[in-house]
Structure formats: C-alpha cells, structure tokens
Amino acid sequence: MNEKSEDRILKDNKNRYAEYYGMQAVFDELYIKSNEGKKFKHLMRIITSKDNILLAYRNIKRNKGSYTPSVDRITIETIERMSQDQLLKKIENRFNNYQPSKVRRREIPKPNGKTRPLGIPSLWDRLIQQCILQVLEPICEAKFNTRSYGSRPNRSAEHAIADANFKINQTNLMYVVDVDIKGFFDEVNHVKLMRQLWTLGIQDKQLLIILRKILKAPIQLEDGTIVNPTKGTPQGGILSPLLANVNLNEFDWWISDQWETAKTRHSFKYKNKEGRTGRDNRALKKTKLKPMYIVRYVDDFKIFTATRSNAEKIFKAVQMWLEERLKLPISKEKSKVTNLKKQKSEFLGFTLKATKKGKTKIGATKYMAETHMSPKAIKTAKAKLAEQIKKIQKTPNSSNCIKEIAKYNSMIIGIHNYYEIATHLNLDLKRVGYDLQKQMYNRFPKSKPNDKYTNGFTRYGEYRGKDKGIVKYTKRKNRYIRYLMKSPILHLADVRNKNPMMKRNTINKYTEEGRKLIHKNLTNVSETELKWLREHPILIGRATVEYNDNRLSLYVAQNGKCSVTGEQLDLLDMRCHHKIPWHITRDDSYQNLTLIKSDVHKLIHATKTATIRALLERLNLNKIAIEKLDKLRVLVGNNCINEKENNLDIFNNEVRYEQLTLF
C-alpha cells in the first residue's frame, strides 16, 4: 500500500475513533458553541477526561513518529505495556503540574541542499498535546476561513490547487501576489498567538498557561546545546499545525474582508449544490474595493486579483500587515507579483499558468489554468527514484530485492497520487521516466529474449498479487511495465491525470450531516455497548492499555459478533483471546487478538476428550466455524479436532499433523 493511501485510511479512521470513545458528541457541541460565539473557560475538564486521554492514545499510537524516541528515549512501545489506570494517572499528574521535557531537534535535509529543523517532543508531551488538540480543533474549525486548506481535517493540497484553478478559469483573475514568510514556524510571536487564542474564545487560563509552556519548551540541539525559544512553534509538535493556522487565520479574514466577505448594504447570496456559498458582486463593484481572493496552505499562500495596479497595492499592503501585525519577517527575494498569462507561479510543488483556450461567448480570448509538476519537484523525485534503483541493484538476495522493488513502486504511486491533478503531468514525467528505465536496463541483470520465466529484467511477466495499487497499472494494456524477479516495476510516466476537486463545504467532521459524507456512522454496534466496554476495561493480571484499546476496536470491527461462531456476543460472556499465546510473544497488538464466546475460548485451549466433546455438543459448530476454530487451536499449540473420532463433517485446515487424534 502506498503512503498516500495509508495516510487517507488513517485520517478516515481518526474520524471515527471519537465515536469509539464517546467523544464525538462533546466535540460537536464545542463546534456549535464556537459558531455561536461562546467563550470557553473550563476546557481542562474535557481535556483531562478519561475518554479524551484514551482517545489521544489511540490517535497517536500508530503514527510513525510514535516509534521515534526523544531526549528521554521513550517510545510508544513503553506506554503500550502500561495498564489503563497507570496511563491515566500519569497523564493526569503531568497536567496537574505540567513541565514539558526538552524537545530533541534534528536537521532534516531539503531538496535544495539546505536543512530544516524538526522538533521531536517526548512521547508524554505528544500525548498531552494530542489531548489538547482534540478539544481545540472543533473550536478553531468553527472560526477558520474556508480558503485555508493546510493541516485541517478533510482538506488537502488538491482542494487548494482546485481553488487556484477556479480563480483562473472562472473568476478570470490573472495576477498573483506571492509573499514569502521567512522561516514562519520559527518566527511565530508568542504574545500575539496567545491573544489570538483568547479572541477565538479559548479563555481557560490554566490551558493557556500550559500552551505557553509548550511553546517555550527547551530545545536540545544535535550537539547537545540547550536553547530556550522566545518565539516560534516547534516543527514536529502535534499542536504546531493548528497553532500556525490560528496565527494566520487573522490574515485570512483580513484579506477576505477586503472583498469576498466585505459587508454591503444589499447582500445577494446564493448556495450551490456542493454547499458552497457565493454571492453576486454587483454591490461590491459599485465600491472602490479591489477584488482579491486568498488561497492558503499553512504558510504558503496566493492572492489572486484582476490587474497589475491592484496586485502592486496588495503586495505592499500584505508585506506591511504581516510585518507590523503578526511580527513576521518577509523574504524580499522570494516575494513577487506574477502575471499568469506571461509567467508561471509555483504552488505546493506545482506550477500554475494561464494559457489561451478559445474564445468566450462575446468573442474575448478565454484563458484556462495549465498546471505542471514543478521542475524542483521533478528533480527531487528523479534523484530519490534513481537512488532506489541502486538499492534494488545492490540487494544481496531475491527476498530483499522484491522488498526494494515494492518500495520503488510505492514511491511511484505516491508521486502519481499527489501530482495526477496536474494537467500536463504525463509530459512532465515522460523524459524522466525513460531516463530511469534506461538506468534500470544498465544496472539490472538481463533476461533472454522472449523468456517469460526469467528472473532478469524483462518486459514479459504477469502480476498475481492483490495489491490494488499495483493491479490498476497491470490491468492497463501498455508498454510501460517491466519485471525483475517476476515482480512488476512501474513506470514513472505511466500516469493518467484527473481534474482536482473543490472542497465540499458540507463535509464536516463536527456535524452529523457532514460526517455522513466522510464515512457511515457506526450502526451495527450501539453506543450503549461501546460505553459498557469503556467503563469495564480489563484491569486484572497483565491487561495493558494497548490490550483494552484493541478490544474496543475489535468489537466494532467484528460488529459485536464472535469471530468463530458469527453469533452476537454477550458482553458478560466475551473473551479477548491472544491468537499466539501472550507468554510466548507478549503481543497485545490488534492482529494478535480476537473476540470470542467463553465456550469457544475453552474449546481452543481444551485438551481432554470429554471437555472437547461436551463443548462441541453445546456449541453445535458448522464446518466453517470448525475451520476457524482449528486455526486458533494450532496457533496455541493444540491439534486440530479429529474428524473421525467426533463424527463431524469437518476437515483440518492449513496445518496437518502425522497423528491428529486427541484421544
């Protein structure tokens, strides 16, 4: 599975995790109250609640960063082994007297040869930040401008590019104002940010003190030096993207109020099928206001307008406003005004340009957006793929070779998934794709002509796997795909572009109607059942927070039914079974657990003839259930149930023994 698909699935899952822990109604209420302009002075009660803390654990436990240690060397694996009570007490104690640990800073290489700083807070601080984020996000989402697309739920770079294209294609705004904020994340003014949070209605003083401490957490550089920041938000912190949007939200609305949301005596509003609100600008056109629209993705933004004169005035005003109002430094070299009819403008790894496309109804020249993968992005992609080809060449055995090929394919699919919305992507990648294929031909072992059974580099082969990301390429009848070790290697230029889709404003994770457009609500499992499971965790013996969290997930995934019999589970008669015994692996992962009836659990571990017969008679299992049961028995070290001795129409699945009798 490629990286973009994994991210999308993770986001979809996060949207429903709040339902698992009964927090969705709380977040919905915060969103409604924020929309109504209410003030929030007692948020810490929600932030430190049991369900919010456990939801925070679930949201971060599978993030790749959770396995990256900070200064204290603790990773998620340490916390997984704690009991639920231990985790809750630890978090509550840290909130009561919060002092952030040092943030470990690493320098990450950039494509231009420079580096950017990445802060790695301790895992305890990440959990604290996640608890806060979950509560602040619905409040802030209600106040954020609709033209902001970065680091927000159910918004993406595709929506930003679609909006930029719309400004060119439909609004006919051909001048773009680019103002580059120099080192934005390192320059955010703490005092200004605290005031902005207060203005948004976040007025819980205990929470604001904690947020100030998070911003001022000491940073440990790679050489061991400790730095105490006076400005900026740590890149890598869970709260940083939200705080960045809070800081620039004031700027979004300032631009918006110049034209798009400017108040006039008469309002001519309308709403289209997608839920987007628009208005007839006839009243605005009678004023001296200058038409302008912002499209922002975190700190990267474009301001579209109609004339160079307007663009020059906006350019100066924006620089002055950002420097004086937000105390943010501007990079003069990277800031400019662009006429899209004559020059390209880079945005989020794409280049935008307006090209002639026929005539309008009144005979005027019509312009349409032409988008490409930016030269910088192409160069970076080519370098990374070329490096991966070398890794494939140097693999010591076929098993590792296939893994490296899979990684190469994942990189190709990731590039395609992100850049497929460019109108001319195929042309952009054609030359680079053939250069990479030539490199493969020179580096990989060759095959004999027309040899379909070779392990060498060849155009002949057949993919028999089930990876949907690969299947969609192999189904196409084209000349692009090559094979090595009988594994397909995708071609960079084998891509089909699609039109970027605008964000539907009706999609909203904090309204019931909006969530229906994201995913189906949990219908097979009631909130009463989930509440019982949350209120009755397994606390005795070796039960961990990971065990209880996965127990809840499995109940939803199995629709509240036994994984062997398929019958509805009785919550008082349910067992959460380790497929491979805990004493062997100490593994409480989701993959190693399953929910079953207590009698099925006894039957999995039973070795005595009388016990097995009695349980089989009581359960009356069918053939499919026996197959599932046998798989679980084999995993715990027991034999499959003997077909002849029990006079049952069953067979032993997957693993057979020389002597199967239990008696």
Model regions: which residues?
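Histidine-centered nuclease catalytic patch
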Residues: 566-598, 604-609
